[in-house]
């Protein structure tokens, strides 16, 4: 199998083939080698940030007429020039190897915010992660097509059971039945609980990514989802607390089950009147029921001991009761309210205190900056495994794999190890 597209080869116009892939970073390939890309994708990327061809040429550092020549197909950029264009256009290099401009990239109506946050212009980081989610999905579909395979569809439930408690029960059973990892129980860490649910969703056919390097603040976005009948995408925020990511993950899965885009935030309004607020409250309730089934919650010794002492909960007792479910004390307390085991007034009075203590504990327990682990988390461990497995089996060559993963060829093996099922996300 050839390792790299060679000068003079014809430009692809159909699906992305293994020999079309070019490396992303310096892996020993001369930077002057032409990058065989689709001109219309170059034009789309430039126009998406409102640059003229001349302005783009100057930012990229080429003659004023060069970008126009690329977009007309008269000339092609070199690898080095394409890397620079990717930086200028704020796009992943992999997007330039799509066969056509992606559609509908900049119309996200689904993202989840902290209480008190207000809608406003997206940050550059949110734009980039949203676009990256679309690109990675397209590339994953290319890999399935190359192997003449269909993405899993186990995440879907049709028809939807009613009421929502039945839907949550069916969803939990469906995901865990096919999950490659068991639930860790009360002795498991927050990372292990998150890892289990991420792996379950990926196995069922949902791509799970993270906002790159935590560059999007949680005050702007906690998570968002892209609904598709085939291979939908959930993006959580890598800067969020581990248990917060877990709840956001299942909240977005609830949106996918309901075939909705969301308008997500973290707040459940008891008196919600607008359709969007009711939808958010409903998705929160479904997520809580998936993670914390009623029977299992009520069977907890800490819960049974307080049937007649509803206001006797302390932070430590809540933490002990919440541990088997991998959720925060605040989320568990809210679940007790929904199940009629704690008064709403007690929850309101303690919520801010418990959130502050939980966030302080999470901050102290955050791990170091392992690049491979963080990159596998951001790209999505399932996506990394999909690409690295295709490379290992020679379905794609090394440079295509490097492009899809945005790494050096020499880094693919260690990144694949970081994406192993049992490694933390």
List the predicted regions and their residue ranges.
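Active-site hotspot residues in diverse enzymes, especially metal/ion-binding acidic/histidine motifs
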Residues: 2-425
